[in-house]
């Protein structure tokens, strides 16, 4: 009688946020398709927990809440993450202990989001291989390494020197010191300390990154040399895994019916992610700029994204009337389906990494309105490296909005960006096909996990 081969188990540990959960779950789907059992270890977070249940065949275990999420407002993002890591070690060890005792659970590996480095202690104690997963770009991972070696005092002094600001990091053209993502994490010193924790305290066996060689070959080569462990670029994971990933917000599918009535490449799609907030004036200027562009638009406005207002009631009635005649306003949209629709000609984005990849995969050029450090770096690559978008800088004014939309949708400049975006689309799709770089990287990762 043939001996039954037990499948090996992989434990995934995501950050409890849409931009981190989505690619982690896509990674899980890709590994599940290669024969691994998947367990997701998550903190107590009801909204995300209910969303993850849409993944049949995945097991879910809870890491007890060690630090209330409300503390992030008191501490700042970097300090909160460091405290979360300190307080989560013991509860995660207990979680892994229970999993290890279950019969038939041969844990091949713990794969954890780079910000959840508390997982290393449990991996080391139970002698389980661990792998880091970066949900952001390879270039951001490079920046973490660079920032981990800086002192806050010297960095602040250097940033007052224009010559130092514009200095290109060696071997990483066009990345400059002033492009390092230092905003959005609170005070500088806790951020640098967090980077040191993220980079220097790890004994992981490998790094997985949601990117592709055709997008970031220099950064990937730099990381491979600097880290001294295998680096696996598996992206874009939403096509590697053939899965859009979980949505934590209810999607308005009726917007697709509206898109079906629009002309090809005529619509500007606007979505600023799950966390962005706007001032009243900014929203009004956006509305007038979109109206004055005379282009149809699909505008995602999350409830509560404008302080003091539930949704769009802050707009004057005549503006709401014109907006709904010219465009479509949704509380949330099925983004991958929207970007792949032939009516969409451009994407106004906050330039989160998932949105950036999703736009490139569909060959859609972008208007970039980044809000914080990582997004600003992505926007720089979109505009200056890949040349598939334009940045909308400074205060949002209706004239600038109108001009940006026309440049992207109507002008020859936008047509050239679209051609470059379509070229990148083909390269990315080739990377996940048999023999492509991401396809091969996934096979190499599977071999690596089976030999660890």
From Swiss-Prot:
Gene name as annotated: UGT76E4
Pfam families: UDPGT
Listed InterPro entries: UDP_glucos_trans (IPR002213)
Covalent S-S links between cysteines: none
Single GO MF descriptor: UDP-glycosyltransferase activity
UniProtKB keywords: Glycosyltransferase, Transferase
Residue sites binding UDP-alpha-D-glucose per the record: 274, 333-335, 350-358, 372-375
Family: Belongs to the UDP-glycosyltransferase family.
Entry's transmembrane regions: none
Name of the protein: UDP-glycosyltransferase 76E4
Keyword Chaperone appears in the UniProt entry: no
EC annotation from Swiss-Prot or TrEMBL: 2.4.1.-
